[in-house]
């Protein structure tokens, strides 16, 4: 049974009945449900209590994850250096710079410059207005840009961001400050997404689809942040690698 969009009172009645009858229930959560899923059970004043607070991954998890980031980014930079050179030469063939820097937000809203191979025209945002890409039909994308985007090669320089510590391999994808501000106006819960370091790929990227709504992607990212797991990180990395191979 699936439950979605049901008022909490009616939902509780349905859940109690289904659990009592041994019926599996799949609940499509609201953001509040996702936040509660990361709560810590306690007892206080002889009462069961759920402590809900800032998402805090364990120091051990953060240490191992950072170690993995350093090792993978270093190995990747060495092994893929010939591909870096070939891609840079191809991108520069249209007369513009090979690399493109853009301000994005990572943990706690800290701004940093994300590094990518340029896939759009140099004057793609000459009016200074931030615009989300509309996909393959975006006329700002160059011929070489279409190829490197399809193969995910435009993201290779982000290994430098990972090595530096601005990004992790896995985490919510970093947004531009203007886009993040817009999302925060539409979805105030979006600010919770900044409680984790941004990533090269993330839960919403590998499990979401092209038509997945920003709200549903937000819930996916918050679910990931609420339940930090190295096993889940590994699964996301494998799915990302598989998707990239399929694109090629």
Report the location of each language-model feature.
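Short acidic-hydrophobic surface loop/beta-edge motif
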Residues: 42, 100-105, 194-195
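A short, hydrophobic C-terminal helix/tail in secreted or cell-surface proteins
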Residues: 243-248
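Short, glycine-rich, amphipathic interfacial segments at transmembrane boundaries or analogous
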Residues: 32, 100-140, 200-219
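A short, structured surface patch at a secondary-structure boundary
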Residues: 134-197, 236
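A hydrophobic, helix-centered structural microdomain
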Residues: 60-124, 161, 230, 236-242
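Hydrophobic alpha-helical segments characteristic of transmembrane helices
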Residues: 22, 27-29, 157-160, 206-209
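C-terminal terminal-structure detector
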Residues: 189-242
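N-terminal hydrophobic signal-anchor/signal peptide
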Residues: 1-78
């Amino acid at each position: 049974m699936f439950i979605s969009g049901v008022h909490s009172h009616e939902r509780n009645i349905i859940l109690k009945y289904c659990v009592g009858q041994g019926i599996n229930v799949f609940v499509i959560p609201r953001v509040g449900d996702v936040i509660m899923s990361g709560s810590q059970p306690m007892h206080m004043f002889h009462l069961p209590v759920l402590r809900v607070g800032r998402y805090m991954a364990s120091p051990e998890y953060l240490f191992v994850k950072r170690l993995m980031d350093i090792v993978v980014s270093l190995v990747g930079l060495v092994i893929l250096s010939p591909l870096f050179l070939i891609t840079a030469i191809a991108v520069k063939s249209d007369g513009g710079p090979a690399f493109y820097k853009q301000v994005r937000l990572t943990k706690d809203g800290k701004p940093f410059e994300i590094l990518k191979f340029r896939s759009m025209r140099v004057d793609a945002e000459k009016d200074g207005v931030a615009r989300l890409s509309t996909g393959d039909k975006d006329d700002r994308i160059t011929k070489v840009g279409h190829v490197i985007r399809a193969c995910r090669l435009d993201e290779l320089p982000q290994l430098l961001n990972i090595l530096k510590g601005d990004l992790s391999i896995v985490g919510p994808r970093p947004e531009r400050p203007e886009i993040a501000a817009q999302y925060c106006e539409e979805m105030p819960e979006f600010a919770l997404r900044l409680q984790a370091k941004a990533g090269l790929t993330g839960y919403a990227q590998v499990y979401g689809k092209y038509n997945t709504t920003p709200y549903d992607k937000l819930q996916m990212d918050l679910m990931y942040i609420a339940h930090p797991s190295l096993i889940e990180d590994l699964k996301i990395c494998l799915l990302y690698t598989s998707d990239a191979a399929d694109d090629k």
